[in-house]
């Protein structure tokens, strides 16, 4: 079993620290300072970094981390080749911490965005999927983003999902506006408000939960997804 900890960074980022014993893998380091502090405080060995896509709020910590750990294994798609020395492709399989890690194509937000699924248990999805939402489609390729969501929907419902941003409350306000009222949505929104009032993360989430509250996962076809995405972009 892995110990997974969110390292808060910037205004709303989570850098995920995946820990096994005294070793740690870092996902999408937007800032090196909190990562280095976390490693030092917990006396950990940094063994690898996983990058999901090439936006600065996921990679800005890389220069400092690579200067400290020049031999580090860094996994990521071609669009982060300036930092990654292990280029991954969709449906590649890695072995990390004795887990089979599947690389899932998650394009749309960026052209080569990927997600990492640890043994059908833990999904690190960057900006492809949020609690109650999904990433903006900066590429304009709505088909790719819709297809990514279908891949996520096909996973076991017990999978824990680790997005890179704390967007849950704003996403749930949109969900409340476009979905039929439900006990699940009300209860999850209430829980999220309590957690944020205590400055605690609302993440991780689960696929089971997201299927109940995430409008984008409920879109039945591409046209409905595009309409929802345009609504959210202007919400």
Curated annotation (Swiss-Prot):
Q: Main EC class of this protein?
A: hydrolase
Taxonomically, the superkingdom here is: Bacteria
Q: Listed GO molecular functions? A: hydroxyacylglutathione hydrolase activity; metal ion binding
Q: How is the cofactor bound?
A: Binds 2 Zn(2+) ions per subunit.
On whether Zinc is a keyword of this UniProt record, the answer is yes
Catalyzed chemical reaction(s)? an S-(2-hydroxyacyl)glutathione + H2O = a 2-hydroxy carboxylate + glutathione + H(+)
Q: Which SUPFAM superfamilies match?
A: Metallo-hydrolase/oxidoreductase (SSF56281)
Give the GO terms filed under biological process for this record.
methylglyoxal catabolic process to D-lactate via S-lactoyl-glutathione
Reported cofactor(s): Zn(2+)
**InterPro entries recorded for this chain?**
Clx_II_MBL, Glyoxalase_II_hydrolase, HAGH_C, Hydroxyacylglutathione_Hdrlase, Metallo-B-lactamas, RibonucZ/Hydroxyglut_hydro
State which Enzyme Commission number(s) the record gives. 3.1.2.6
User: Which controlled-vocabulary keywords does the entry list?
Assistant: Hydrolase, Metal-binding, Zinc
Read off the Gene3D superfamilies from this record. Answer: Ribonuclease Z/Hydroxyacylglutathione hydrolase-like
Q: How does it assemble?
A: Monomer.
Similarity comment = Belongs to the metallo-beta-lactamase superfamily. Glyoxalase II family.
Q: Would you tell me the protein name for this molecule?
A: Hydroxyacylglutathione hydrolase
